[in-house]
């Protein structure tokens, strides 16, 4: 079976768009990781279209975050169900991606909701 537009021949990639032209110019399209802050409103049905990238042969991965510091990559436990619904809404309405990552480094304290960052020194 030939690879789909979501299955690159290469394992390398970049974090966030801006340098993908280097892979394309070399004839070696790889992965492109997007990071999205979605919040946890279960009624929000907004989405993104990643087909401008996937249609060029780039494989798109999207990390779904509740937010960034101090909101937390995932919300407080009381909002888990709302965040799950928001993620489901986003995935169902978005195009050009089939690899989804929920949250980022949840074992890293600064990624938790309400985390306080201590300055070193």
Q: For each of these PLM feature ranges, what is it?
A:
Residues 13-17, 33-35, 61-65, 100-103:
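A cross-family glycoside hydrolase active-site/sugar-binding cleft signature
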Residues 16-22, 41-51, 83-89:
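Alpha-helical scaffolding within the catalytic cores
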Residues 43-45, 70-121:
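Active-site cleft segment of glycoside hydrolase catalytic domains centered on the general acid/base Glu
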Residues 49-51, 55-77, 102-103:
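Structural motif corresponding to the early beta-alpha repeats
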Residues 7-10, 28-30, 56-60, 95-100:
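Short, well-ordered coil/turn segments that N-cap beta-strands
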